[in-house]
A protein has these predicted regions:
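Cytoplasmic membrane-interface "Motif A"-like loop-to-helix N-cap segments
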Residues: 122-134
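Transmembrane alpha-helix termini and helix-breaking/packing motifs in multi-pass membrane transporters
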Residues: 2-25, 85, 89, 203-220
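C-terminal membrane-cytosol helix-exit motif in multi-pass small-molecule transporters
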Residues: 10, 29-48
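Intracellular juxtamembrane helix-capping segments at the cytosolic ends
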Residues: 168-181
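Hydrophobic core of transmembrane alpha-helices in multi-pass small-molecule transporters
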Residues: 153-168
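C-terminal ends and interior cores of transmembrane alpha-helices
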Residues: 135-149
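Short amphipathic helix-loop junctions that connect adjacent transmembrane helices
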Residues: 81-98
Length: 227
C-alpha cells in the first residue's frame, strides 16, 4: 500500500508540483531513517523455538540454490537497470511516465501474486521456475529486437510489464529453499544468498554498461543467455 501511494504521489507530484530528484531522495531518505528509529524502539522482539546460527553457512547441498540466486540477481539487474534505461534512452520516458509503468506492475502483481502462490503449491517449484525463465528469455530477446527491428513504444511497455510479471514467480525459489534447508540454516544461508545476489548487482551493471556502449541489443541477448 505504501508503495502504491508513493508511485501515485510521484506521478501526480512530478507534473503538478514540479518535484525534483533532490526533494524525492532527501524526503524518502529522511522518512526511511525515521521509520528505522521507530522500529528500533517500538518493534517487538520475537523468540523462536529454533535458535538460528549467527555465522554464515555455506553447504554443498545448497549449491544449486546459490547458483539460482546469482542468476536471479543478474536477471533482476536487467529489468531494474537496462530495461528502465531503454525506456528513457530510446523512447524518452520521463520520471512520471516510467513510474506509471511501475504502478501498473504493482497493481497487476497485487492480483496475480496469489495465483502464482496457488500454482507453485499445486504444480511445484520446478514448473514455476521453468515458466519464469522461459518467459524471461522471450522478453529479453524481444528487448533486443526493439533495437534491431526498431519496434515501437507500445511493445516495449508491454514487455516491461511482462518482465516484472514473470519475476513474480521468483517466490518459487524461496519455497524451494525452505524445503531443502534445515530450520537453523535458514537465516545464515539466506544471508549468503543475499550476498551472492548482490554480487551480480554490483558487477553486472558495470560489465553490461560497457557492453551497452557497443550495442544495447547484445546486452539483452546476453541477458537471455543468463535466463
Amino acid at each position: 500500500i505504501a508503495t502504491l501511494f508513493a508511485y501515485i504521489g510521484i506521478i501526480v507530484g512530478w507534473q503538478k508540483l514540479g518535484l525534483s530528484f533532490n526533494f524525492l531522495y532527501l524526503s524518502s531518505g529522511g522518512l526511511t531513517v525515521l521509520i528505522a528509529v521507530l522500529c528500533l524502539f517500538f518493534f517487538p522482539h520475537f523468540r523462536t523455538e529454533t535458535q538460528p546460527k549467527t555465522k554464515l553457512v555455506i553447504r554443498r547441498r545448497y549449491c544449486l540454490y546459490y547458483a539460482l540466486e546469482f542468476l536471479s540477481g543478474a536477471r533482476r539487474q536487467i529489468f531494474v537497470v537496462f530495461a528502465a534505461f531503454m525506456m528513457v534512452e530510446k523512447f524518452g520516458f520521463e520520471v512520471h511516465q516510467l513510474t506509471a509503468l511501475f504502478l501498473i506492475n504493482l497493481v497487476i502483481n497485487i492480483f496475480v501474486a496469489p495465483l502464482f502462490g496457488y500454482f507453485i503449491a499445486h504444480f511445484g517449484e520446478r514448473r514455476a521456475l521453468l515458466i519464469e525463465y522461459s518467459g524471461l528469455i522471450c522478453v529479453f530477446l524481444a528487448y533486443g529486437g526493439i533495437y534491431i527491428f526498431d519496434w515501437g513504444v507500445v511493445l516495449a511497455a508491454t514487455l516491461f510489464v511482462l518482465d516484472h510479471l514473470f519475476f513474480g514467480l521468483r517466490i518459487a525459489l524461496k519455497t524451494y529453499f525452505q524445503k531443502i534447508s534445515s530450520p537453523e540454516d535458514i537465516a545464515p544461508t539466506a544471508a549468503v544468498a543475499l550476498t551472492i545476489n548482490h554480487i551480480a548487482a554490483i558487477f553486472l551493471p558495470v560489465l553490461f554498461g560497457l557492453l551497452w556502449l557497443v550495442s544495447p541489443a547484445i546486452v539483452f541477448m546476453a541477458a537471455a543467455f543468463l535466463a
